[in-house]
């Protein structure tokens, strides 16, 4: 009996050590697992690229805002060739930079919208390293610049948030309700916590994220903040087959919002509405500002 117990004990110890070894290996070799364990937001949520692709086919101007002593934020103002219908403050998603989204911007300006877009710190030509407080500060300061530059137009203002830009679009709208005429969200993230839950590669990390909301950004939480927006029309777009941000995240944000609101269920890839459903998208945006 003692021999059997000894064998069981050694087997159990070997399994534990093996598990620790495997866990340590993946922790050291998989950046995403390491980021989730350490809650390293710069690697969990932001995937900037510095190289800008050519945007000469679009009519735009480039400006630089100094946010802090060492942080320069680049902004891009795209203008339609003909009459302008409204001005859009566009907050892009976690990957790339403004030029990555030129295919999404093009249908807007071709249909009479002026588009102002920014690259957060660390994205494109903008300097610095992204973090949740910093990118929100970049967004708030550039939104005021957007308002200053479009004030003379006397046109309606639309805040448009894509994916990770969704919670920031919600926060901007919440804090400027008298100056925003419509809020558009496409493939929006629900919260930083929901991202960690959705992308956790193992059950333990998923459960850890569920139980610890305080460990994630609480300064702006899309599903919470949208409930504080009163009379601003809201169009929430989410694809049933979105593989980047689960469909339920968009539904949760919609359910938390007050009227007036509209949920548009699509079947496109993540945030591809403006490309795959251009006419319907333009019509729905126009409906929000009529």
Identify the meaning behind each predicted range.
Residues 171-219, 224-225, 275:
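Hydrolase active-site cap/lid region
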Residues 104, 222, 246-255:
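Short alpha-helix in the alpha/beta-hydrolase fold that links the catalytic acid
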Residues 151-163:
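Alpha/beta-hydrolase fold nucleophile elbow
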Residues 4, 8, 16-66:
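An N-terminal hydrophobic leader/cap segment in hydrolases
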Residues 241-245, 271-272:
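Acidic catalytic loop of the alpha/beta-hydrolase fold
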Residues 229-230, 235-238, 242:
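Short beta-strand/loop motif that positions the catalytic acidic residue
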Residues 269-279:
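Catalytic histidine-centered segment of alpha/beta-hydrolase-like enzymes
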Residues 68-145:
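Membrane-embedded segments
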């Amino acid at each position: 009996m003692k021999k059997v117990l000894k064998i069981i004990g050694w087997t159990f110890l070997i399994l534990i050590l093996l598990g620790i070894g495997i866990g340590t290996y993946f922790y050291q070799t998989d950046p995403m697992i390491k980021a989730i364990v350490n809650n390293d937001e710069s690697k969990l949520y932001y995937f900037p690229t510095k190289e800008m692709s050519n945007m000469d086919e679009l009519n735009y101007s480039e400006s630089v805002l100094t946010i802090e002593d060492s942080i320069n934020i680049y902004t891009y103002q795209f203008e339609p060739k003909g009459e302008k219908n409204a001005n859009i403050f566009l907050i892009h998603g976690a990957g790339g930079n403004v030029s990555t989204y030129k295919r999404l911007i093009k249908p807007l300006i071709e249909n009479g919208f002026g588009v102002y877009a920014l690259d957060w710190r660390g994205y494109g030509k903008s300097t610095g390293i992204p973090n949740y407080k910093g990118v929100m500060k970049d967004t708030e300061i550039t939104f005021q610049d957007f308002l200053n530059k479009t004030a003379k137009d006397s046109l309606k203002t639309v805040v448009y948030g894509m994916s990770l830009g969704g919670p920031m679009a919600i926060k901007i709208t919440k804090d400027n309700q008298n100056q925003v005429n419509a809020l558009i969200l496409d493939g929006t993230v629900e919260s930083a916590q929901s991202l960690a839950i959705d992308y956790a590669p193992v059950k333990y990390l998923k459960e850890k994220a569920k139980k610890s909301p305080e460990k994630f950004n609480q300064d702006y939480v899309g599903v919470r903040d949208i409930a504080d927006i009163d009379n601003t029309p809201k169009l929430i777009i989410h694809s049933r087959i979105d593989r980047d941000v689960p469909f339920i995240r968009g539904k949760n944000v919609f359910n938390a919002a007050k009227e007036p609101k509209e949920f548009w269920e699509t079947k496109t890839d993540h945030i591809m509405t403006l490309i795959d459903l251009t006419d319907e998208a333009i019509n729905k945006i126009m409906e929000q500002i009529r």
